Amino acid sequence: MVRSRTIKRPPQQDRSRVTQERILASASALLEQRGYAEFTLQKVCKESGLSIGAIYSRFSSKDELLRTIQEKHIEELDTDVMQIVRKLAAQGDSLQSTAPAVVKEFSELYRKHQSLLRPLMAIAAMDPVMAQEGKKFDTRTKQQFRHLLLRHKNGIKHPNPERAVDNCFEVVFASVTHVLGLGTAPNVMGTAPNVRSKGIWRDFVEDLSQMVSTYLLSEHSGISKGELVALNAERRAGR
């Protein structure tokens, strides 16, 4: 059974809040620079210039500190996702322009946050609480991705637009996280160092955008929209 997240109440005094933010900033920087393998509370003390007692007075364990880092980072990610949604929704436009824009914006989101996402995703593979929070973020992100593309549902040529958009999200997410080496140690993913070149990353995102656009805008053989409607009606009737 996955235990619920148990984080202490936020500090009420300004001085205490500043100290907590200092701990979180130092711990996040250490995690980004050294990864989880070299992450210890002793090193957080050295990085922040605070005592181990100051840390334990605010976080009961290393796990709680890491979960709080993830919580704050997900808040930042959620904010960035909503900025993307507002930006693209305001532009309106057609599916032809929206599809590549959505792929590019969400790809850049993960690239922007890769240095902290990488260790946090690796830790989440071992921590069920962090894994659960990560899945919740993925679900929210997928919903926004779907919202932006399904606004142009009538322009999607696939007989099942919802399924097509879901497939696009899974492909984009899997491709981007693989290329950026998210959820793995930096020396495990052979492709990750390549994206340090802006040109290679740009080409990758352009190609990924083109693949998604072509998939959504091209006619698909097989079951027709009419056949799909009839099939769905039969399924609902059989429930």
Task: Explain the meaning of each model-derived region.
Residues 12, 18-26, 164:
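N-terminal positioning helix adjacent to the helix-turn-helix/winged-helix DNA-binding module
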Residues 75-82, 97, 104, 108-112, ...:
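Amphipathic alpha-helical packing segments from all-alpha helical-bundle domains
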Residues 23-31, 77, 106, 172:
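Short hydrophobic clusters on alpha-helical segments that form packing/core surfaces
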Residues 41, 71-78:
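Short, basic, alpha-helical segments at the C-terminal edge of helix-turn-helix-like DNA-binding modules
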Residues 22, 26, 30-64, 68:
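Helix-turn-helix
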Residues 84-91, 117-124, 152-153, 179-187:
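Secondary-structure edge/capping motif, primarily at the C-terminal ends of alpha-helices
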